[in-house]
Amino acid sequence: MKIGLFGGSFNPVHLTHLDVANGVLKRLGLDKVLFVPAGNPYHKEQGEMLSAELRYELVKKAVQGCSGLGVSDIDISADGPTYTVDTLREASRRYPDAELYFIMGQDSLETFTTWKGWQSIPELANVVAVSRAEADHGAMSQELKRIFPEVVESGQDVWQMKGGKSIYIIGDFDFVISSTLVREEWKKGRDVSKLVPKAVAECMNEKGDKLKKFWR
């Protein structure tokens, strides 16, 4: 089984998140893509970040009825702060027979080598970098070779790692919607039903009092 892990704060989840998850699911022939909402912030102010439980609930609403999409509590159920490498290790424990695909934004490549245990990430999972349609794939290719000098290009926007895992760049997404935009529109009292899945918009309306505690 091929499982994609799509991590993020999802504060809140929106339609572009679903587009990315569905796009990766179909392009790479995965069996499932699991959204992995981040846990509550540790040792810092919560700010506009909704509680982990509420963000998880909104993602659950978003993927309900979406074939191939699901949500995981790997990060929100962890005791203490979580890092990508820890998330992947826990996913490997939960899904021992699965081939894992870690989905991240292309901009994360710039800080990838600062992540805890980053060298272990491509040993635990294939890496999928998603980007805008107009992104410079040539520059991204050079960045990949800088981070992983041993990579060998094995196809268009596909690189083979030394240990057998692959790195994919999928760059045809439209990122016009952001969580920041959704929050700002919601705070202004505007309809966000064209920015988030219908079930998410309904849940946000039902839990308006809870949202107001964070989105002021």
UniProtKB/Swiss-Prot annotation:
A Pfam match: CTP_transf_like
Enzymatic reactions: nicotinate beta-D-ribonucleotide + ATP + H(+) = deamido-NAD(+) + diphosphate
Family, per entry: Belongs to the NadD family.
GO biological process: NAD biosynthetic process
EC annotation from Swiss-Prot or TrEMBL: 2.7.7.18
Gene: nadD
Pathway: Cofactor biosynthesis; NAD(+) biosynthesis; deamido-NAD(+) from nicotinate D-ribonucleotide: step 1/1
Record flagged with keyword Transferase: yes
Identification of the protein by name: Probable nicotinate-nucleotide adenylyltransferase
Record GO terms (molecular function): ATP binding; nicotinate-nucleotide adenylyltransferase activity
InterPro entries, alphabetized: Cyt_trans-like (IPR004821), NadD/NMNAT (IPR005248), Rossmann-like_a/b/a_fold (IPR014729)
Main function: Catalyzes the reversible adenylation of nicotinate mononucleotide (NaMN) to nicotinic acid adenine dinucleotide (NaAD).
Enzyme class: transferase
Keyword annotations from UniProtKB, A to Z: ATP-binding, NAD, Nucleotide-binding, Nucleotidyltransferase, Pyridine nucleotide biosynthesis, Transferase
Source organism: Maridesulfovibrio salexigens (strain ATCC 14822 / DSM 2638 / NCIMB 8403 / VKM B-1763) (Desulfovibrio salexigens)
